[in-house]
Structure formats: structure tokens, C-alpha cells
């Protein structure tokens, strides 16, 4: 990301925001490493959505507004894509990794008058991997809305005062989506049928709000760069719910 930012023709505000967001994903991969080390079941869907959205997040940085992408950026993107593919293949195709990812989170357990810190098996019925994937993918809606909203503040700094209400609405919608997804997925993991339908409604509403704002405030370039990752996450959510 730093190489691409350095070689970019224009180090503008939007590129800086997108570069920072892409670099924050390094923390996401550290979190993924922690989940794998502890054998957590959630590592598979988390690794899948993290890898897919990372490729999109960095890919939109490589392509300039005009001309051909610089060679260092292309090489870095190729290496990053290969690494993300390797992560997904290991999580979903490796029998050794699959046999390791069977643990649940630890917590305080009171049994026989003794308090201990150990693995807590959820009381709810076993959750399928696709439901977990839908949950993790849906949780990306909020940041994928807030990042372009932050990019759009650059137009306000450039004197486009008329965009203030739309940008504020964009931020509010991004925050509201996070709470809606949190509420919905809590019941989704309990396999409530209405929660599936509600998540579909949330997904379609998110797209209906975010994509027009991307086009209006960021143009066709912003629609592709910032809309495509959200569309990908939405399609993955809908596909996971269908499975």
C-alpha cells in the first residue's frame, strides 16, 4: 500500500483514506492469526471475508484515474492476492487446519462450587459455517460505508458545502447499519427464519443507500472503487444465507 501511494500520480485525500483503511487490515490478519492459533471456529468465515475485501480494498488503490498502474503497485498487488488466496485455501482445504478449528471461546464457568476459566460450548444449536460467513460478511457493511463517507469529506474541504447534509446522513447510515446487523445476526445464529429475511432487507437497504451516494459524491470512479467491495460483501452474505 505504501509503495502504491508513493508511486501514485496524486497523493490526494481520498487515496490517503483508502490507503489507511487498507493498511488497517494488517490488524485484521493479526486477529485472524490469533483465532487460528486458538482453534476458533470463526476463523474460517473471518479469514474468507477479510481476504476477499482486502483484495478489493488494495485493488482499487492500484488502478489510477487515468493511465496504466505503476509496476511496483502491480507487483505488490499480485503478491498480496496470492497470499490472500493461500489463506483461503488453507482455511477451507487443509484437513489439518480444519481439524484444529473446532474450539469455542473461553469464559468463566461455575461448576460444583468451583469457578474456572475454560472453553464455553454455546447453548444454542450448532451453527453452520455459512451462517457464520453471512454474519461476518454483514459486519463489514458499516466500515465499507464509513470509508467512502470519510473520503467524501474531502469534497467538503474543497468547498462543496452543499454535500454536508449528504455526508452526515452517510455517516449516520453507516453507524445505524452496524447496530442493525448486530441485532439481526444475534438471532440469525439462533436460526430464526425472520432474522434471515431481515438481514436480506438490511443488505438491500445498505446497497440502496450507499451506491447512489458513492455515485453522487465520488463519481463513477468512487462508485467502482468504494461500491464494488460493498457489493461483493452483500453478494457473499446473500449467497451464504441461501446455502
Model-derived features: positions:
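Topology signature of small-to-medium multi-pass alpha-helical membrane proteins
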Residues: 1-243
Amino acid at each position: 500500500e505504501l509503495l502504491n501511494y508513493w508511486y501514485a500520480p496524486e497523493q490526494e485525500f481520498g487515496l490517503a483514506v483508502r490507503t489507511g483503511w487498507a493498511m488497517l487490515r494488517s490488524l485484521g490478519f493479526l486477529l485472524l492469526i490469533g483465532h487460528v492459533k486458538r482453534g476458533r471456529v470463526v476463523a474460517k468465515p473471518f479469514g474468507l471475508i477479510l481476504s476477499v475485501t482486502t483484495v478489493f480494498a488494495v485493488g482499487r488503490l492500484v488502478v489510477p484515474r487515468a493511465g496504466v498502474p505503476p509496476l511496483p503497485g502491480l507487483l505488490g498487488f499480485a503478491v498480496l492476492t496470492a497470499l490472500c488466496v493461500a489463506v483461503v485455501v488453507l482455511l477451507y482445504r487443509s484437513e489439518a487446519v480444519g481439524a484444529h478449528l473446532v474450539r469455542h471461546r473461553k469464559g468463566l464457568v461455575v461448576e460444583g462450587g468451583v469457578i474456572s476459566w475454560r472453553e464455553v460450548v454455546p447453548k444454542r444449536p450448532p451453527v453452520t459455517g455459512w451462517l457464520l460467513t453471512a454474519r461476518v460478511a454483514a459486519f463489514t457493511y458499516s466500515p465499507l460505508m464509513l470509508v467512502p463517507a470519510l473520503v467524501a469529506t474531502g469534497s467538503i474541504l474543497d468547498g462543496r458545502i452543499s454535500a454536508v447534509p449528504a455526508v452526515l446522513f452517510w455517516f449516520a447510515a453507516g453507524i445505524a447499519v452496524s447496530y442493525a446487523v448486530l441485532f439481526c445476526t444475534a438471532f440469525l445464529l439462533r436460526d430464526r427464519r425472520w432474522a434471515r429475511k431481515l438481514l436480506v432487507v438490511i443488505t438491500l437497504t445498505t446497497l440502496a443507500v450507499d451506491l447512489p451516494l458513492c455515485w453522487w459524491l465520488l463519481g463513477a470512479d468512487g462508485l467502482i472503487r468504494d461500491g464494488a467491495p460493498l457489493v461483493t460483501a452483500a453478494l457473499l452474505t446473500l449467497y451464504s444465507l441461501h446455502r
